[in-house]
From Swiss-Prot:
Nucleotidyltransferase involved in the post-translational modification of proteins. It can catalyze the addition of adenosine monophosphate (AMP) or uridine monophosphate (UMP) to a protein, resulting in modifications known as AMPylation and UMPylation. Coiled coil: none annotated. It comes from Bacillus cereus (strain AH187). Transmembrane segments: none annotated. It catalyses: L-seryl-[protein] + ATP = 3-O-(5'-adenylyl)-L-seryl-[protein] + diphosphate; L-threonyl-[protein] + ATP = 3-O-(5'-adenylyl)-L-threonyl-[protein] + diphosphate; L-tyrosyl-[protein] + ATP = O-(5'-adenylyl)-L-tyrosyl-[protein] + diphosphate; L-histidyl-[protein] + UTP = N(tele)-(5'-uridylyl)-L-histidyl-[protein] + diphosphate. Its EC number is 2.7.7.-, 2.7.7.108. Keywords: ATP-binding, Magnesium, Manganese, Metal-binding, Nucleotide-binding, Nucleotidyltransferase, Transferase. This is Protein nucleotidyltransferase YdiU. The keyword Manganese applies. The active site is at 253 (proton acceptor). InterPro entries: SelO. The lineage of its organism: Bacteria, Bacillati, Bacillota, Bacilli, Bacillales.
Length: 488
């Protein structure tokens, strides 16, 4: 046990107030020679840590699972999940929650070690993680944070000095993940599947207290909980769609109750606009394709509603009706959020009847001409319509006239419209080929400079600076189709 607390550890463990069926207490498995390869300074400070102290050997031992900070209470969480539509009892198979850091601002964040060794939920897995996928999660989660999309974050990555065996021998690593909590739709499915209404109620009460305290005194608090989660997920999925983010594995165990994006295994950002885009090697049917994400979110939330039925109303028929009514509201909430976001991407302040068709026409043309999603909006923002099949087409020129005329009709100036576009159209995203380039250099050569440079550029996606331009270039046709793989 590490007693020295100059690093700033301030751990609580409220999750252990839940019935013990929700977790198993287990220590991390030590590793041979841990080395800190990445520390998130700004996140460390916001959590109340001293970054310089975190670089010391005693703290690196904590990130590796070789020691525990004062107040730690390591545990693996139990949950269930529909994985590609099939229900399984699951749990943290390679991660441990070591505690909840209480920040100087009075907020509570889970501190989880990912890749910390086997747990009772490992299901024949080795409980370990490889360096590449852990660095990938660090890069993408930080890019999402910079894009202002709710997300779990990465505090540190350490190498273990031990190999991890997947298809080949890979260097092992442990990621320290930070989240508002790790309560998932699958956590509620787990409680419901066990058949204890008391446990289900305990989980719902704990979740409300932790994430939605404003509804604690609500007359129908469990219905209100469902409403709040639906609202947050509608907003989250709209934000994904607006930047072209494809999660890749929207199983119910990867849908958080807090409304944060979690699990960056097979995710990627879309290059050419195509509703059918899939990157994940295991998503052979396209279940989680870009255009399907809103529908899959609604499906996942319906599983949450099902799990809550025993506590929504004492009459089962009435409870079922409440669940169905609430789930039916998701699509309208999502559409509203997405439409509002799309209007901002096109500099539209006011509401006009033609806006829907203006947006639809542009997306249809982008799909037809295989236009780069991010760069199309970037070019419209900068008003630099370089020679591309889309911009050279007569139909785009016609659309452009309509759009310009629509901008002129507004009370707001064109300058203000373009400024709003700039704040809503990222100049840079973590392009798949650039992320791979950074990972290749780090994993094979121990060269982290490529990753550092990429992270620096991704930190201000709406800045439109010249040093970002090299990262705006789409991949060469030879780099497509890009495939992602689950780290496990």
């Amino acid at each position: 046990m590490t007693k020295n607390n100059e690093a700033g550890w301030n751990l609580d463990h409220s999750y252990t107030t839940l019935p013990q069926s929700f977790y198993t207490e287990i220590p991390p498995t030590p590793v041979s020679s841990p080395e800190l390869v990445k520390l998130n300074h700004s996140l460390a400070i916001s959590l109340g840590f001293n970054p310089e102290e975190l670089k010391k050997e005693a703290e690196i031992a904590i990130f590796a699972g070789n020691a525990l900070p004062e107040g730690a209470h390591p545990l693996a969480q139990a949950y269930a999940g529909h994985q590609f539509g099939h229900f399984n009892m699951l749990g943290d198979g390679r991660a441990l929650l070591i505690g909840e850091q209480m920040t100087p601002a009075g907020k509570r964040f889970d501190i989880q070690l990912k890749g910390s060794g086997p747990t009772p939920y490992s299901r024949r897995g080795d409980g370990r993680a490889a360096l590449g996928p852990m660095l990938r999660e660090y890069i993408i989660s930080e890019a999402m944070y910079a894009l202002d999309i709710p997300t779990t974050r990465s505090l540190a990555v350490v190498t273990t000095g031990e190999p991890t065996y997947r298809e080949t021998k890979l260097p092992g690593a442990i990621l320290t993940r930070v989240a508002s909590s790790h309560i998932r739709v699958g956590t509620f499915q787990y409680a419901a599947a066990r058949g204890s209404i008391e446990d289900l109620q305990s989980l719902a009460d704990y979740t409300i207290k932790r994430h939605y305290p404003e509804i604690e005194d609500h007359e129908n608090r469990y219905t209100a909980l469902l409403q709040e989660v639906i609202k947050r997920q509608a907003s989250l999925i709209a934000k994904w769609q607006l930047v072209g983010f494809i999660h890749g594995v929207m199983n119910t165990d990867n849908i958080t109750i807090s409304g944060e994006t979690i699990d960056y295994g097979p995710c990627a950002f879309m290059d050419n606009y195509d509703q059918g885009t899939v990157f994940s090697s295991i998503d052979t049917q396209g279940r989680y394709a870009y255009g399907n994400q809103p529908y899959m979110a609604a499906w996942d939330l319906a599983r949450l509603a099902e799990s809550l039925i025993p506590i929504l109303h004492e009459d089962e028929e009435e409870a079922l009706k409440i669940a169905q009514d609430e789930i039916s509201k998701f699509s309208v909430q999502y559409e509203n959020q997405w439409f509002l976001g799309m209007k901002k991407k096109l500099g539209l302040f006011s509401n006009e009847e033609q806006d829907q068709s203006l947006i639809e026409q542009l997306l249809k043309m982008m799909e037809k001409f295989k236009a780069d999603y991010t760069n199309t909006f970037r070019s419209l923002t900068l008003n630099t319509l370089e020679n591309t099949p889309l911009f050279d087409s007569p139909e785009f020129k016609e659309w452009y006239k309509l759009w310009q005329s629509r901008l002129e009709k507004q009370d707001e100036s064109k300058e203000n419209a373009y400024e709003m576009m700039k704040n809503n159209n990222p100049s840079i995203i973590p392009r798949n080929h650039r992320v791979e380039e950074a990972l290749e250099a780090a994993v094979t050569s121990g060269d982290y400079s490529v990753m550092e440079k990429l992270l620096e550029a991704l930190a201000n996606p709406y800045a439109y600076t010249t040093d970002q331009e090299e990262y705006c270039v789409p991949p060469a046709p030879t780099n497509r189709p890009y495939r992602t793989f689950c780290g496990t």
